[in-house]
Each structure stands twice: as C-alpha cells, then as structure tokens.
A protein has these predicted regions:
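Cleavable N-terminal export/targeting peptides
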Residues: 1-26
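Short glycine/proline- and aromatic-enriched beta-strand/turn motifs that initiate or cap beta-hairpins
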Residues: 22-87, 243, 247
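Residues on the lipid-exposed face of transmembrane beta-strands in outer-membrane beta-barrel proteins
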Residues: 29-31, 68-72, 123-127, 141-143, ...
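Extracellular/periplasm-exposed beta-strand and loop segments of Gram-negative cell-envelope proteins
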Residues: 37-63, 86-119, 146-165, 173-175, ...
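Early exported N-terminus immediately downstream of N-terminal targeting peptides
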Residues: 84, 133-146
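Transmembrane beta-strand segments that form the barrel wall of outer-membrane beta-barrel proteins
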Residues: 182-196, 222
Length: 248
C-alpha cells in the first residue's frame, strides 16, 4: 500500500513540476494614473445615509498608483504569483445635507476631506490550457486579502470605517502575439455574488524589447463593492497603465 501511495504521489508531483528544470521567474511592475468613476457609500448599510465621494465631493485626480507582482512559472502550464496592489484616492468639498456615517454625523456646508483606501494582496494559481508560440490562455484561482478604509474629516470631527477580509476570485490571462515584438495582453481577477462583486481587469499592448524584458501600455478597470447590513460601498476606478516585466 505504501509503495502504491508513493507512486501516486510521485506521479502527481511529476504532473505539476514536470519541466521544473526550465522553470523561471518574472517580476512585474505597473504604475500610471487612476481616476475615480464612482464611489457610493452608506455605512452602516441598513441605517446610514447614502452619499457619493465622487458626486458630493471632488476627487483629487488623477492619482498616482503602483503595483508589483512576482510570478513563478513552474513550467509551460502552471503559474504561481503574488501581487501587491495598493490604492488610495483623496476627496474634498462640502456636503449639502447632513450625513449619518458610521457612529456620527457629517455636517453640511463645512469643509470636508475624505480618503478612500483599498489595498489588495493576492495569491494566484493559473493553469494555461492553451500554450503555443502565438497564443496563451489560462484560467485559475486567486485568493485576495483586502484591506480597505473610508475616512471622512471635518474640523474637529473625523469618522472612519475599515474592513479587512478574504475574497476568492477567478483569474484569467490571454496573450496573443501579433508580431515578433508586439502582443495583445488581457488579464484579470473577477467574481460576483448576491452580496457583492469584484473585477480587476486590464487590456494592454505589450512590446517585447528583449528576450527577458517587456513593456506595456494599456487600460485597467477596477470595480466592485459590497451590499450588507454593515457596509454599502460600490466603487469604480479607471487606470492608465504603464508596465514592465522582467523575466529571469
């Protein structure tokens, strides 16, 4: 029995790690500008007042952003990556009405400062179902830890709400090699449920400068939110993307 189990274990490991001798790694860095398209808030979700950070206040935009990913390309079929993707956006203005928020009240016609922070930490496994010289397509699973906070300040009064939680997502990647140097790249994480949704999707044109270095320009959409008794928040952000990938 032990010999059978050992054989099965070796077989499974060989499937996953086959070709590990040619395994390599990549580092991906992305930056650019981000614009707020929507940011609706009601906290608590069942008794608070609904307000919009983008409509009632004004966003300080575009805001600069940065994210980084490290990927272990186990072989042609299997990829394992970690991503750090922080995001913060500042808003300012005045409310035209009193707002019940968190455990207090935000007054109208008073200078108001707000900050929306949404930091994301993700671990992704992806299996490449198609892997040719011209086309790569893969699907996988992402485990995301979100660390979010909404804070609103008026003279002598600061109210904030933070939320940390785990979100499972479906990951995908499509890479189509148009010419020897240029490719179309689409990738992202997304999932929807009855209580909320999350989408982080990018489309870009990538230039293969050398065998180990590629640059890209593109667009990223970050959208989602939650609707619960504790929190109602749905936001939308548009990104102008500049990125680089180093493979070694």
């Amino acid at each position: 029995m032990k010999s059978i189990l050992s054989a099965k274990t070796l077989f499974l490991c060989s499937l996953l790690l086959g070709g590990t001798a040619s395994a390599d790694f990549s580092l991906d860095f992305e930056s650019g500008g981000v614009w707020a398209g929507k940011n609706d808030v009601k906290i608590p979700g069942d008794t608070g007042d609904l307000f919009s950070l983008t409509d009632d206040l004004k966003a300080d935009q575009p805001a600069a952003y940065f994210r980084a990913r490290a990927t272990w390309h186990i072989n042609d079929r299997h990829d394992l990556s970690v991503l750090y993707a922080p995001l913060s956006m500042d808003y300012s203005g005045t409310f035209d009405r009193p707002i019940d928020f968190r455990d207090g009240v935000l007054n109208p016609n008073v200078p108001t400062q707000a900050r929306f922070r949404f930091d994301s930490y993700r671990l992704t496994y992806r299996y490449n179902f198609i892997k040719t010289d011209r086309l790569t397509f893969g699907l996988g699973l992402t485990g995301k830890i979100r660390d979010a906070e909404i804070s609103v300040s008026q003279p002598g009064n600061t109210l904030s709400d933070d939320n940390t939680g785990f979100v499972p997502l479906i990951n995908f990647q499509l890479a189509w090699k148009i010419t020897e140097q240029f490719s179309f790249l689409a990738e992202g994480d997304a999932l929807a449920s009855s209580r909320g949704r999350a989408e982080d999707v990018m489309a870009a044109i990538q230039w293969q400068a050398t065998d180990n270095l590629a640059f890209r320009l593109g667009y990223r959409l970050l959208e989602g939110g939650v609707d619960s008794d504790d929190t109602y928040n749905f936001s939308l952000f548009h990104y102008a993307v500049v990125g680089a990938t180093i493979r070694f």
